[in-house]
Amino acid sequence: MSNQKALVIFSGGQDSTTCLIQAIQTYGRENVQAITFQYGQRHAVELERARWIAQDLGVKQTVLDLSLMRQITHNALMDDTAAIETAENGVPNTFVDGRNALFLLYAAIYAKGQGIRHIIAGVCETDFSGYPDCRDVFVKSMNVTLNLAMDYDFQIHTPLMYLTKAQTWALADEMGALDYIREQTHTCYNGIVGGCRECPSCILRERGLAEYLESKKAV
């Protein structure tokens, strides 16, 4: 995709790093940028990893401060004194209302100013925690809304949308990045380097990796 530019919404976690590496291979390193959001998340260690990975991969990274979210919403992802639990509706209390809507909005504003039309997000509705703003129907509706709001032809890509975590690990392996993503990315909601293996994010990550490695042995 020569002469086309892409912006990756980048957290430093498994999914967004997979998307960033795929974007580099698809569009070319010189045509890819990363945008990262600081919104008061308790797992701020991922911000450090995001900066390191972006620099290591040679990609320009922009970090935006959305910490104002603390003024209007409260949840366990932004309160390190709260226990991470699953609500009666099956959604963990780490869900941040409006987060992905805001991420896509600010990413689109930035992208238009940079002449970028392709926006890439690592959201997924297969192996996920039940967050409503990770669903394909939401992303598609947001794509239409942003195009109308800014009179611009954005294309929001979600390459992991229908992949299981095991399949996401397989994709990383296909790109020659399995070990890199295992060793360099951070996913833990509790902000523990190497993972706590107890929070919803760690459980999904470790279970998916185990499934993929087991299937790889069987081949």
Curated annotation (Swiss-Prot):
Highest taxon above the source species: Bacteria
Keyword annotations from UniProtKB, A to Z: ATP-binding, Ligase, Metal-binding, Nucleotide-binding, Queuosine biosynthesis, Zinc
Cofactor or coenzyme needed: Zn(2+)
Record-level GO BP terms: queuosine biosynthetic process
Secreted found in the keyword field: no
Enzyme class: ligase
InterPro entries per UniProt: QueC (IPR018317), Rossmann-like_a/b/a_fold (IPR014729)
Signal peptide (from-to): none
E.C. code: 6.3.4.20
Catalyses which reaction(s): 7-carboxy-7-deazaguanine + NH4(+) + ATP = 7-cyano-7-deazaguanine + ADP + phosphate + H2O + H(+)
Pfam families for the chain: QueC (PF06508)
Annotated Gene3D superfamilies: HUPs (3.40.50.620)
Cofactor annotation comment: Binds 1 zinc ion per subunit.
MF GO annotations: ATP binding; ligase activity, forming carbon-nitrogen bonds; zinc ion binding
Binding site for Zn(2+): 188, 196, 199, 202
Pathway assigned to this chain's UniProt record: Purine metabolism; 7-cyano-7-deazaguanine biosynthesis
Sites where the protein binds ATP: 10-20
Biological role stated in the UniProt entry: Catalyzes the ATP-dependent conversion of 7-carboxy-7-deazaguanine (CDG) to 7-cyano-7-deazaguanine (preQ(0)).
PANTHER family linked to this entry: 7-CYANO-7-DEAZAGUANINE SYNTHASE
Family affiliation: Belongs to the QueC family.
HAMAP family, per database record: QueC
Name listed for the protein in its UniProt record: 7-cyano-7-deazaguanine synthase
Record organism: Neisseria meningitidis serogroup A / serotype 4A (strain DSM 15465 / Z2491)
Gene encoding the protein: queC
